[in-house]
């Protein structure tokens, strides 16, 4: 699970869990506390109701479930809701780009069973390298 800055596309937090842990259970650890708006896929439905999110002034914009989106009516309101979901998806795509770099540029396709601590270290190093890779143009321009 990673937290990505919406403007820069850089990874700001990493949580490594086993595959059977749901995304929403680690959402609080991905937030650094200064977020105004958080975008999530449909797996984060109901995040604002969770106890660990109580008292936060963050606005959550979570995707509609695919089944609900598929049956939106072909009316002006339905088309507007579909456009809103498309806009949310464009912003959420920023989170997927670092995964592409980790998988394609650094070849981290599958995780071997080494223990959660070793895998956590490897993912953290890959996240740092991904940030350097994504910020390379800015870093080279600044000298």
Q: Where are the language model's segments positioned?
A:
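Intrinsically disordered, low-complexity and often Lys/Arg-enriched segments
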Residues: 140-143
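Polybasic low-complexity intrinsically disordered regions
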Residues: 1-57, 65, 120-131, 137-138
